[in-house]
Amino acid sequence: MAGIAMKLAKDREAAEGLGSHERAIKYLNQDYETLRNECLEAGALFQDPSFPALPSSLGFKELGPYSSKTRGIEWKRPTEICADPQFIIGGATRTDICQGALGDCWLLAAIASLTLNEEILARVVPLDQSFQENYAGIFHFQFWQYGEWVEVVVDDRLPTKDGELLFVHSAEGSEFWSALLEKAYAKINGCYEALSGGATTEGFEDFTGGIAEWYELRKPPPNLFKIIQKALEKGSLLGCSIDITSAADSEAVTYQKLVKGHAYSVTGAEEVESSGSLQKLIRIRNPWGQVEWTGKWNDNCPSWNTVDPEVRANLTERQEDGEFWMSFSDFLRHYSRLEICNLTPDTLTCDSYKKWKLTKMDGNWRRGSTAGGCRNYPNTFWMNPQYLIKLEEEDEDDEDGERGCTFLVGLIQKHRRRQRKMGEDMHTIGFGIYEVPEELTGQTNIHLSKNFFLTTRARERSDTFINLREVLNRFKLPPGEYVLVPSTFEPHKNGDFCIRVFSEKKADYQTVDDEIEANIEEIEANEEDIGDGFRRLFAQLAGEDAEISAFELQTILRRVLAKREDIKSDGFSIETCKIMVDMLDEDGSGKLGLKEFYILWTKIQKYQKIYREIDVDRSGTMNSYEMRKALEEAGFKLPCQLHQVIVARFADDELIIDFDNFVRCLVRLEILFKIFKQLDPENTGTIQLDLISWLSFSVL
């Protein structure tokens, strides 16, 4: 219940703008300005209690408390490491980012790319920090985390060994913005060791809030040049690199003056007419050096003489050192990998860019209710969360000769690095996209059934199921309605996720789920209509007071269920019996009279029939995944969120819902629906309660 309340509160805060870059969420409720001012007033340097200078902040295994790698480590402030520490000198450069004893080169490559864009760098690394003015041993940074900007505060105690920084450091040893940025990122992920191993695109996204895709240039898609042009039009960040095969290859220069293992940026893509034919050209920037391409279409290449002088002047006008043109074919031949970080509309301040349309949806997989696994598990796959995508407008131009709607889908699993300390790691995740059949178009209140997925193939799917934080793919489909189904590879895996869809044109996205509905069968009974046989049974069971209490009801039902071989049950708990009495006790006596007991008896027989029919394997019990169908048979349609609550409340560790819990669930639902209907006679879908009423209903 606490989790539901937290989600509701968070949704309300997000609607008010909390989590935007301008109103970043304070991680662990630590406010930078408040903490710094407190330290300055006290004349003390900040010590972060939430990420202490202790072995627990380093790691849990290779960097754990008893590891040889962590012996002799001392935590020191920059003022103790060098005579004149600086936060940042003359802007950020790649020499500020040298890898240490941590396998987070993926993160450092993303930081290096971040330095190519001063505006975006300043969002992540506030540049007005220093070791001189108002220095209090405290620094702050901003990261994008699953749709929200989060401000993280750290103290400046850094792990050292033999007087040297253990992890990332600057080449000169006196600049500390990158080391403190790495520490803040380690904090939000639980510890330094949690950063070991990852994809550069993960860092790209956490520094920009964008959605990052990458291409192996040995196997490029046929429309890659057009993809690059469109990405540049939309203000995306594009980076490329040449793979290295050994440590000796790092920073090695090829005979045509390209540097291996080096982060380049792509800044232009143009088609020019040369000697009667069209040439595709790519403009590359080497941001940290004068080393430039000497192959065809370099600055001094005679090929430029075959181009219209005005076009040539336009393209070769030098913006800054380190920028050069090369043919697209040479680009594919010499470079290994291209990464595109598509930025969100709020990141781009320039109105000249053609901005992506962005939608984000949050969801979760919960064991026993919405963690159905992939298509290999047909009995549970349909239980996964489902999202409707309505593609309405085609792209303005067909980049590959095919009309359609271009969109990117990114499925991110949340907080998995943080859980490495607890022995957890990334789930293997992926998704499928299904075309909505004509008879269901326009409906969002129907969770697609098991039979639909047994008879319908996916129209598109993620390239693979993989244990990375994000699975991302680019698609182009005709206008229409589609359902996206995210899943873990295996069922029964708990996890939170967010889905982001970037589309060229406006599209509509929403959760596909059953609407809340209760068709409760009202059993009409008059005492005169009750047969003599049932009257004699009631008189025998009720005793002299002609009423049945919850305790008497428990004894009666235990005897009844003991005779049934098709339902495994130890009888009903006293809690279940009490709420059954509460449901029908119209006179407030706390007991059931003849008519009330007759209605309850009829209901229990109906519950038995449903339970037996849903139990297809004749085990005498019900699996939690069968509960959804059982609730529908009983007249209740509920969204995924409520199924998660029901399974958490009524299923055991093996995801079994016994007959007692099944009945208790149905009775509680019936009571709650009836209360709501009484308090909402106009069917507005909303009621108001004071505290005493809320508490009275909550203890049911």
From Swiss-Prot:
Record: residues binding Ca(2+) 2: Q229, K230
Positions bound to Ca(2+) 4: E292, D299, Q319, E323
Region (Domain III): 345-514
Entry binding sites for Ca(2+) 7: D615, D617, S619, T621, E626
Reaction(s) this enzyme catalyzes, per UniProt: Broad endopeptidase specificity
Chain residue ranges for the region called Domain IV: 530-700
Propeptide positions: 2-19
Regulation of activity: Activated by 200-1000 micromolar concentrations of calcium and inhibited by calpastatin.
UniProt: Ca(2+) 3 binding residues: I89, G91, D96, E175
Gene Ontology CC annotations of this record: calpain complex; cell projection; chromatin; cytoplasm; cytosol; dendrite; endoplasmic reticulum; external side of plasma membrane
Pfam families hit by this protein: Calpain_III (PF01067), EF-hand_8 (PF13833), Peptidase_C2 (PF00648)
Main subcellular location of this protein, as a coarse class: cytoplasm
Superkingdom assignment: Eukaryota
Known tissue expression: Ubiquitous.
Effect after changing R469A: Decreases catalytic activity
Assembly with partners or alone: Forms a heterodimer with a small (regulatory) subunit (CAPNS1). Interacts with CPEB3; this leads to cleavage of CPEB3.
Name of the protein described by the UniProt record: Calpain-2 catalytic subunit
Species the sequence originates in: Rattus norvegicus
